[in-house]
Amino acid sequence: MASQDTTASNRPVAPTENVVVDELEGTPHAHCFDEEPMTIRLTLAEGESVPAHQHPDRRIVLHLLSGELSVTLGDDEHAVEAGEVVRFDGNQDVSPTAIEDSVGLLVLAKRTE
């Protein structure tokens, strides 16, 4: 039986996982890991968009790695450029549109409150 790593306080430690974002397969979405928090690479070509949708009970962090997006959140539109990080609530309509070819990393964390 394999032993599980623990911290000094005897809490179990999950194994470290590593992925190369550029090597993930799938567009517009490619899942980085199989467990929480949900982590996804978003790839959109210039002019491509994702239809309005929601991620109920999630807080979302978008780190735009390259390109430029216009992200509609509810009734508001936000310009996001490469290098920027945006955090928003998934309990609203979300629709990103690529102003130019874009790659971003999304982390969808379950709400704790």
Predicted segment positions?
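A short, N-terminal "cap"/entry segment at the start of jelly-roll beta-barrel domains
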Residues: 1-36, 40
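Conserved short histidine dyad/triad with adjacent acidic residue
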Residues: 25, 38-55
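Histidine-centered metal-chelating micro-motifs
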Residues: 49-51, 86, 90-95
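Glycine- and acidic-residue-biased ligand/ion/polar-headgroup-sensing regions
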Residues: 57-74
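A cytosolic small-molecule/anion-sensing beta-strand core signal
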Residues: 65-66, 81-82, 100
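Short acidic-glycine-tyrosine-enriched beta hairpin
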Residues: 74-91
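Ligand-binding loop in jelly-roll beta-barrel domains
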Residues: 90-113
